[in-house]
Amino acid sequence: MKFVLVSGGVVSGVGKGIIASSCGLLLKTLGLKVTAIKIDPYINVDAGTMNPKEHGECFVLHDGGETDLDLGNYERYLGVDLARDNNITTGKVYQQVIENERKGKYLGRTVQVVPHVIDAIIDTINRVSRVPVDKSGEEPDVCIIELGGTVGDIESMPFVEALTQLRHRAGKNNFINIHVSYVPVVNGEQKTKPTQHAVKSVRSAGLIPDLIACRCEKPLEQGTINKVASSCQVEVNQVLAVRDMPTIYQVPLLLEEQGLLRELKETLKLDDVKLSPARVSQGQEVWAKWQKIVPLGYAETVDIVLVGKYVELHDAYLSVIKALEHSAMRCGRKLNLIWVDSEHLEEKTQKEDPTKYHKAWHDVCVAKGILVPGGFGHRGTEGMIRAAQWAREQKTPFLGVCLGMQVAVIEAARNLCELKDATSEEFDANAEHRVIIFMPEGSKEKLGGTMRLGTRSTHFQPGSEFSKLRALYGEATTIEERHRHRYEVNPDYIEKLEQSGLIFIGKDDSGERMEVVEIKDHPYYVGVQYHPEYTSRVLDPSRPFLGFVAAAIGCLDQITKEILQDAGFANGSINGAHF
């Protein structure tokens, strides 16, 4: 097993996740099998109960693991399916060590950070790195490890020590450290001191950077590169200038251009890894497709409005943004995403701040498509309901995801079924017409890990042959998508809702839980209880999102026809081979 560690200094949030993902993609183009691990030093066991405004999106994996959003980047770039164990947190490690101590596994010894916590971290990395993550079912060749936060943080120290020991145990040519640092510009001059101090700090902690990736807004000057190389004891060709790019999908192209793949091959002796001609050819095909679908830019745009609750922090909807971008690229357009706070569409804002109210409604009215994503709680939902009503009545393409589907159902119940007080049990537990109810298997007391999580099957129902969404899935009868919710459509209202024109075309295994809703006589009005954004890939966009964006552009029929004709485009495959 070969390891690529991506660490960071100076400040967090400089793009370690994108650089780690890009590195993995480049290795994959050689035909190697690549997996990834994200280390988060926080004490939370997982990201399931974290506030999206503080931490960003909670990404859901196929096994129901609620993790850091960077694991979404890994899956999107590498085309793999990771599991909850691929996200290591301080909380998980200490929980494991304490449980082992309670079971007597340490035979009465004093349990300490060194060696017990350190060994637990190393053992977890070694175990998880060998778990197959693609359909080949084979052990990965390379594991990308991203160390979250910045080296030097108190909470990071056990992980730094563990990674230092892991490097020694892995042996020569089996471990490489890429250190990511920020190069600020002050009065027009690129400053290297922060990078010098960061590298000095990481060296003193025991990790020796082999490559230094300098994040910068503009290309680094040669003098700056030379200064970083000499002060950080690396060669000039081991300094990567990772400047801001028009899209993050061009970062792999930039890194390949700067010779990252050459350095990885040389340091890790990747030419010694035995690969079948089929794997090599497959890797080359992935790279060719990536280069084709990620051009410098598109002349035309598509205007999409996102009506959400957490619009102040765009990372709260990261996977939604990426799914829209993937779909726009597939349709040959650039995404112009317009953010609308759902509260600004409500009557309260009309009275208190008419300017915000009219601005929000102007954006909704002129948009080519309206998206209502997931969320929790009552705040802002009346604005979402009004946006869903506008999309339905004005024939504007609409996609509702999770909560977005639920507000579409509430809107139809109120305005088509004339149940004026229709609402969700989440918003009003005592309302007469609760068309959305709490799932019986959930828990209102224990929030962490108690939702309906992970990959579940959805079955398209007889009579759904008219469905635009079903056609986008290649006329499949059963699909698998990831879920994260506590509430569902009340079965008592299904008949009345369907009589009004809201057709529930997809249901779960029992046939009692509603998963997909669609309006027949509409350009594209779809609601899904699952989260299709979690499985969207750069080379294989999510079907609900692809249909939504294509309908907004006016090319839905063309895209659907191409999907039905191109078997290789379906199910994340190239010529039938999973990548």
From Swiss-Prot:
It catalyses: UTP + L-glutamine + ATP + H2O = CTP + L-glutamate + ADP + phosphate + 2 H(+). InterPro entries: Class_I_gatase-like, CTP_synthase, CTP_synthase_N, GATASE, GATase1_CTP_Synthase, P-loop_NTPase. Residues 310-558 form the Glutamine amidotransferase type-1 domain. GO terms for biological process: 'de novo' CTP biosynthetic process; CTP biosynthetic process; pyrimidine nucleobase biosynthetic process. Its EC number is 6.3.4.2. One of its GO terms (molecular function) is CTP synthase activity. Pathway: Pyrimidine metabolism; CTP biosynthesis via de novo pathway; CTP from UDP: step 2/2. The active site is at C402 (for gatase activity), H531 (for gatase activity), E533 (for gatase activity). SUPFAM superfamilies: Class I glutamine amidotransferase-like (SSF52317), P-loop containing nucleoside triphosphate hydrolases (SSF52540). Pfam families: CTP_synth_N, GATase. GO terms for cellular component: cytoophidium; cytoplasm. Keywords: ATP-binding, Glutamine amidotransferase, Ligase, Nucleotide-binding, Pyrimidine biosynthesis. Belongs to the CTP synthase family. PANTHER family: CTP SYNTHASE, CTP SYNTHASE-RELATED. Catalyzes the ATP-dependent amination of UTP to CTP with either L-glutamine or ammonia as the source of nitrogen. This is CTP synthase. It comes from Neurospora crassa (strain ATCC 24698 / 74-OR23-1A / CBS 708.71 / DSM 1257 / FGSC 987).
